Amino acid sequence: MKLLVMSDSHGYTEKMRTIINDNRDAECIIFLGDGEHDWDDCMADIPGMNARRQIAVCGNCDPCSFLPVTSFDNIGDHKFYITHGFRQNVKITLDSIYMDALKNERDVVLFGHTHRPFYEEYNGVHLFNPGAVMNGRYGVINIDADGDLSFEHYELA
């Protein structure tokens, strides 16, 4: 199963649209906030979006959002903790978001906010930031038939 992960578009709707169109084989699309209007525009404009699972949370630059700040989702055999990361101060430390994952028995944490691609596996918890769509960056997570995860960062040409 292919998961497309994006964050921090900040008005760069066309970059988001390109990323989504380049990854039409993704079964699930996840948006980590800071660009809710970009997300809404793409979800409305791109044919076939309703056929895919969609998960979105708000970021600190999404005022008056109706999106949740955090989402706990099971995808395959994995338990995902999905958030923008601003409330966990991820620009300073990942300790808080890691402890939240442990407390909520999550094995995958997806966050944005820093605009920097990041991946680390620590004591069985995968921490993944796709980077910022505004900089042409996004991530892909693949879950194979055995449930094994792979995490990749990409950048638009």
List the model feature ranges, each with a label.
Residues 10-14, 36-40, 61-66, 88-93, ...:
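Active-site environment of divalent metal-dependent phosphoester hydrolases
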Residues 46, 70-74, 101, 117-119:
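Short secondary-structure boundary/capping segments
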Residues 99, 103-105, 121-157:
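Binuclear metal-dependent phosphoesterase catalytic core
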Residues 5-7, 29-34, 55-60, 81-84, ...:
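Active-site neighborhood of phospho(di)ester-bond hydrolases with catalytic His/Asp-centered motifs
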Residues 51-90:
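Helix-adjacent hinge/juxtasegments
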Residues 92-100:
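Charged helix-capping and loop-helix junction motifs
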Residues 3-5, 74, 80-82, 138-141, ...:
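Core dinuclear metal-dependent hydrolase active-site scaffold
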Residues 1-49, 62-66, 146-148, 154:
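N-terminal active-site segment of His-dependent metallophosphoesterases
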